[in-house]
Swiss-Prot record:
One of its GO terms (molecular function) is metal ion binding. Keywords: ATP-binding, Cell inner membrane, Cell membrane, Cytoplasm, Membrane, Metal-binding, Nucleotide-binding, Protein transport, Translocase, Translocation, Transport, Zinc. Its cofactor is Zn(2+). It holds the Pfam family SecA_SW. It comes from Desulfotalea psychrophila (strain LSv54 / DSM 12343). HAMAP family: SecA (MF_01382). Gene3D superfamilies: Helical scaffold and wing domains of SecA (1.10.3060.10), P-loop containing nucleotide triphosphate hydrolases (3.40.50.300), SecA, preprotein cross-linking domain (3.90.1440.10). SMART domains: SecA_DEAD (SM00957), SecA_PP_bind (SM00958). Zn(2+) binds at residues 834, 836, 845-846. This is Protein translocase subunit SecA.
């Protein structure tokens, strides 16, 4: 109550932010009279002037009014589009590193040019991030005309480009691309062996278009580069063949809210019987239990044409939020293989992680981050907590006149769909275009069949018809057009009204259910009523919808029964609307908790990744790593001396045989120490004794190999050992995370346990790196002078081939999966035939050189 009164007196926080910006907008407008009379050459010269002023120490903040005025005039001359005042406000919000919520049709793409131009003047690079290649290419080429005019370099990153093209694109002042391409390029760069091969040049400023889709919806999806694990796929088919025996409630239970399925005791017993196992819960049977659980998920939780489609003998994931297919993406942890077995298509090998990062941690690397979307306010708390981004609601240039009608609720789905088709037919008869929003492919096809029977012409846009997406959406505002779109497919493309449609009432939105998130519902509504156009929307619901069935109250159904309502009789009631909104809030809160929880775990992994990648970068950047090698040697020597000296005993009784054996393992040396040498010595003396032997061995080796060759060998071995052990460490971390939840049963905090054990694993990784690098270095021999060059040349050639193969396999477009099923990109397996054509296994051929 008091909060509402204060808001009335002082205005909301959003109002205060906008009020602070207005004087800046006035200054930009005042400069128009100075900028407008300039000739083209004088306007272009402003870019050079701005760069010189920055070089002399002037800040971007000081340049903002004049640079915005220059960009506005340039856009007007080149594109014939002048930035509105609200777009100036949006540009200022973005420059300040905030999220601008701008309604559909308000010109987000044009707005972004203002901060992009200003920040591009610094020469440090600006990344404009979009959700798919089509939008990246479209926006880059469209706005690139203005950047060209002003003398700014720009480029785009799209799927299929090679490293030379990517390096050139990142070197530009302004780079457009998708979140996937930026993220995968970061991972690929950190798998390379030369700094000159890196594509990216830093993380200065990023503007994320459709920021809610990328930073919220896809936050649960790590980007992963992976290689095939060395295991058979036969077990997937064997497990799949017995799944028909398992019955719900008797053998397994389903929690639809948590989206989990669990075996009962009877289910475990049935599994033991069918798989001929004595104890399915025994550690020796852990693989069979894991496969059985994944097969249950595949059969019970994942639906064909909802969660995935089968296309050309492949299981292809369907994005939950956009309805787009994600070619090349695979669920992890054996789930994708279980789906392949379920659908009776070829079961591919499982994957092992080689490099991974979440979008949350990737985008937090930028010095400044900003975003644009039509729907962010419902997730403002999450943006602030996770990314420290404030959301500012932008006023529309024209008043919003769309009519959002009350929800209509039916007892069952059949009645709901009949009502939907009736409304579409009525609107079509009037000539009004209709956009029908569905949550899955099967619903879109059901509505399409019903419309065909009703003789209403229509277009269907879902994962099966994604190729014509932009074309279908662009035409959706024409007279009498009916378009069925799954999960906001076509987002990013404006629906412009055809001739005469405004007079008919504009675009009408019909939604066949509510999404779990209010934000997705608002996105669908926002397709109508752009830039002051008329329009309307209505949501059709039934008590059988998943949202109401799983999260809603059973009281709603009871009320409808007591009222004696007929099947085709709808109800509109405030209590039901509140129940729906409460259900959505529950789901949003639940999903936020999941993302926050996952980030807490990923932050542990992220710290380790930063350390390894930074050390790797320093090795690549330095010509000489001998100081690091010497430090490793000193640590190993110190540990050896500590292990084999025991000052409670006479030094002659120490384990000298064990010490000599370990010296042979670690340094490939076998000193012959006399009894006199071993008499009455202490820890420090043993340490110096070992250090002397090792130093002598190292000097001899350096003399034999030559100093330059030795430095080259040190770098090669250090990088190869780090990369190999990092891959194994990622696998260990995957196993740790998978089982850590069980610690809760032992009254321990799983997150604290994960942090503790992850720290131990990382410590072990660092020690193993030291021992393997030093051991390998002490054993290597150069027979011919050009051996190292030949080894380096072969390694570089093979590495380039692998990176090209990874590049070719990285999928284009959008990406999103459940949080436990990341995206993968394949790499050569150790046991697969070597790509050089020798006929040998990869690990026995070119793999040895890596």
């Amino acid at each position: 109550m008091i909060g509402k009164m204060l808001t009335k007196v002082f205005g909301s926080k959003n109002d205060r932010v906008l009020k602070q910006i207005r004087p800046l907008v006035t200054r930009i407008n005042d400069l128009e009279s100075t900028i407008k009379p300039l000739g083209d050459a004088a306007l272009v010269a402003k870019t050079v002037e701005f760069k010189e002023r920055i070089a002399k120490g002037e800040s971007l903040k000081d340049l903002l009014p004049e640079s915005f005025a220059v960009m506005r005039e340039a856009a007007s001359r080149v594109l014939g589009e002048r930035h509105y005042d609200v777009q100036l406000v949006g540009g200022i919000i973005l420059h300040k590193g905030r999220i601008a919520e701008m309604k559909t049709g308000e010109g987000k793409t044009l707005t972004s040019t203002l901060p992009v131009y200003l920040n591009g003047l610094s020469g440090k690079g600006v990344h404009v991030v979009t959700v798919n290649d089509y939008l990246a290419a479209r926006d880059a080429e469209w706005m690139g005309q203005v950047y060209d005019f002003l003398g700014m370099s720009w480029d785009k990153i799209i799927h299929g480009m090679d490293d030379v093209e990517r390096r050139a694109a990142y070197a530009a002042d302004i780079t457009y691309g998708t979140n996937n391409e930026f993220g995968f390029d970061y991972l690929r760069d950190n798998m390379k062996f030369e700094l000159d091969d890196f594509c990216q040049r830093g993380f200065n400023f990023a503007i994320v278009d459709e920021v809610d889709s990328i930073l919220i919806d896809e936050a649960r999806t790590p980007l992963i580069i992976s290689g095939p694990a060395e295991m058979s796929t036969e077990l997937y088919d064997n497990i799949n063949s017995i799944m028909y025996n398992f019955k719900v409630e008797e053998h397994y239970t389903v929690d639809e809210k948590a989206r989990t399925v669990s075996l009962t005791d009877d289910g475990i017993g049935l599994g033991e019987e069918l798989l001929d196992l004595e104890n399915l819960c025994d550690p020796s049977s852990i693989e069979q239990l894991h496969h059985l659980n994944q097969a249950l998920k595949a059969h019970v939780l994942f639906q064909r044409d909802v969660d995935y489609i089968v296309n050309d003998g492949q299981v292809v994931i369907v994005d939950e939020f956009t309805g787009r297919t994600m070619e090349g993406r695979r669920y992890s942890d054996g789930l994708h293989q279980a789906l392949e077995a379920k659908e009776n298509v070829k079961v591919e090998q499982e994957n092992q992680t080689l490099a991974a990062i979440t979008f949350q941690n990737y985008f937090r690397m930028y010095d400044k981050l900003a975003g644009m979307t039509g729907t962010a306010d419902t997730e403002a708390a999450e943006f602030k907590k996770i990314y420290d981004l404030d959301v500012v609601l932008m006023p529309t240039n024209q008043p919003m006149v769309r009519d959002d009608y009350a929800d209509v609720i039916f007892k069952n789905e059949d009645a709901k769909y009949r009502a939907v088709v009736r409304e579409i037919a009525e609107m079509h008869e009037k000539g009004r275009p209709v956009l029908v929003g569905t949550i899955s492919i099967d619903v879109s096809e059901k509505i399409a069949d019903m419309l065909t029977k009703a003789k209403v012409p229509h277009e269907v846009l879902n994962a099966k018809q994604h190729a014509r997406e932009a074309e279908i959406i662009t035409a959706a505002g024409q007279v009498g057009r009916v378009t069925i779109a799954t999960n906001m497919a076509g987002r990013g493309t404006d629906i412009k009204l055809g001739e005469g449609v405004r007079e008919l009432g504009g675009l009408h939105i019909v939604a066949t259910s509510r999404h779990e998130s209010r934000r997705i519902d608002n996105q669908l509504r926002g397709r109508a009523g752009r830039q002051g156009d008329p329009g309307s929307s209505r949501f059709y619901l039934s008590l059988e919808d998943d949202l109401l069935r799983i999260f809603g109250s059973g009281r709603v159904s009871g009320i409808m029964d007591k009222l004696g309502m007929e099947e085709d009789e709808p109800i509109e009631h405030g209590m039901i609307s509140r129940a729906i909104e409460n259900a959505q809030r529950k789901v949003e809160g639940h999903n936020f908790d999941i993302r926050k929880h996952l980030l807490e775990y990923d932050d542990v992994m992220n710290k380790q990744r930063e350390i390894v990648y930074q050390q790797r970068y320093e090795v690549l950047a330095g010509a000489d790593v001998s100081a690091e090698i010497q430090e490793m040697v000193n640590d190993i020597v110190r540990n050896l001396a500590s292990e084999f000296s025991d000052e409670r005993l006479d030094s002659l009784d120490w384990d000298w045989a064990g010490c000599l054996e370990r010296l042979q393992e670690a340094f490939s040396v076998q000193p012959e120490w006399s009894e006199e040498t071993r008499t009455d010595i202490k820890f420090e003396e043993l340490r110096d004794l070992i250090a002397g032997v090792v130093a002598q061995k190292y000097r001899e080796q350096e003399e034999e190999n030559g100093a330059d060759t030795q430095r080259q060998l040190e770098k090669i071995l250090l990088l190869q050992v780090v990369d190999g052990l990092w891959k194994d460490h990622l696998l260990s971390m995957d196993y740790l995370k998978e089982g850590i939840g069980l610690r809760g049963y032992g009254q321990k905090n799983p997150l604290n346990e994960y942090k503790r054990e992850a720290f131990q694993l990382f410590g072990h990784l660092m020690e193993t790196v030291k021992s393997q690098v030093v051991s390998s270095l002490m054993r290597v021999r150069v027979v011919h002078e050009n051996d190292v060059d030949r080894m380096e040349e072969e390694r570089r050639r093979r590495h380039e081939e692998e990176m090209q193969r990874i590049q070719a396999l990285v999928p284009a477009g959008n990406a999103d999966e459940e949080h436990q099923q990341p995206a993968h990109v394949d790499k050569i397996g150790r046991n697969t035939p070597c790509p050089c054509g020798s006929g040998k296994k990869y690990k026995k051929c070119c793999g040895k050189l890596s």
